[in-house]
UniProtKB/Swiss-Prot annotation:
Bias (Basic and acidic residues): 223-250
Cross-referenced Pfam families: EF1G, GST_C, GST_N
Gene3D superfamilies linked: 1.20.1050.10, Glutaredoxin, Translation elongation factor EF1B, gamma chain, conserved domain
PANTHER family: ELONGATION FACTOR 1-GAMMA 1-RELATED
Region feature (Disordered): 210-269
Protein name, per record: Elongation factor 1-gamma
Chain ranges of the GST C-terminal domain: 87-215
Keywords assigned: Elongation factor, Protein biosynthesis
EF-1-gamma C-terminal domain mapped to chain residues: 262-422
InterPro entries, sorted: EF-1-gamma_plant (IPR044628), EF1B_G_C (IPR001662), EF1B_G_C_sf (IPR036433), Glutathione-S-Trfase_C-like (IPR010987), Glutathione-S-Trfase_C_sf (IPR036282), Glutathione_S-Trfase (IPR040079), Glutathione_S-Trfase_N (IPR004045), GST_C (IPR004046)
SUPFAM superfamilies reported in the protein's UniProt record: eEF1-gamma domain (SSF89942), GST C-terminal domain-like (SSF47616), Thioredoxin-like (SSF52833)
Top-level taxonomic group: Eukaryota
Amino acid sequence: MALVLHAGKTNKNAFKTLIVAEYTGVKVELAPDFEMGVTNKTPEYLKLNPIGKVPLLETPDGPIFESNAIARYVARLKADNPLIGSSLIDYAHIEQWIDFGSLEIDANIISWFRPRFGYAVYLPPAEEAAISALKRALGALNTHLASNTYLVGHFVTLADIIVTCNLFFGFTKLMIKSFTSEFPHVERYFWTLVNQPKFKKVLGDVKQTESVPPVPSAKKPSQPKETKSKAKEEPKKEAKKEPAKPKAEAAEEVEEAPKPKPKNPLDLLPPSNMVLDDWKRLYSNTKTNFREVAIKGFWDMYDPEGYSLWFCEYKYNDENTVSFVTLNKVGGFLQRMDLARKYAFGKMLVIGSEPPFKVKGLWLFRGQEIPPFVMEECYDMELYNWTKVDLSDENQKERVNQVIEDQEPFEGEALLDAKCFK
């Protein structure tokens, strides 16, 4: 006897169970002629779930609602199922990522989606908060996937199915390419999974949305007309005369002009003689005599009043035991620093010929402190110790030269790799 799943054919929460069924071989059928907002309000349906939740699974032992619970149930119907892990720690990690996908990814996508599609009132601060929280979650997921093909272990698990279905909703409704390109490992993961045969059988050919839906225009309620009887009952009041308003001012009352975005505090600093883009071009274009041309040019351009230099060192170098994981860690950090590209230049060195590898770097920032918005938005910053360069110390100044130049050996050790943020 097949289990009956009550949901629409395009319900991403139903997809979770249908994909699990493909992996387990459990027979699950969609209820015929299900219509959201109609079927789930019938007396028969409300007997299965008093609040009309969708999806709902009918089983020989009674109904189950909540999509993650349904997917877990179907996964556990098959003994020794790799979808739920082979050890207690695997099981815990699978549950961890299921919760993460629901609370950090799905919840924020839904908060972004509902007002854009007219299901809730559009409030710009609420949308900004949802997008910011979603980016933070995708950043964390991107870091994990930099060194992992799947969320747990080396095979598809229930966590991958649920998180991918959550991402599916975002990729197909809201998250355009320019948004997801900030998270390349998430992109690679998503497209790898949705093109797996068992996923594809349920999801079909997945296409990423090309635009974010515009905000629905709010209709102003029409003013009720006063009845003639009311007009007769109430004596006319003398209207107060107000000076005629300029047309421009009157128009503002009807539709307020969009407020300009607040400027970044770094744009409000006193002008600097150093043009950061000029330095970046000099760095990129210097192929020979690097110290004589690029390094000398840097110090000629450098404005100690308008910019500051900072050394950084990874706090947990003892953990850097795998070369490609260490390189991906640094690469992910540089990707997440993209928000500071207008105000920063950086060099990161991965040092050592054998593990554990050391990660050290040098950063040039606009202003005299590390920009607060960078500290707040890029969580990698907390993983490094930061020391402001003292230019009165010739040894520190020479160390700046060596980092910019990728000098090898560096502090007596070979360089595994050098990465530049510009």
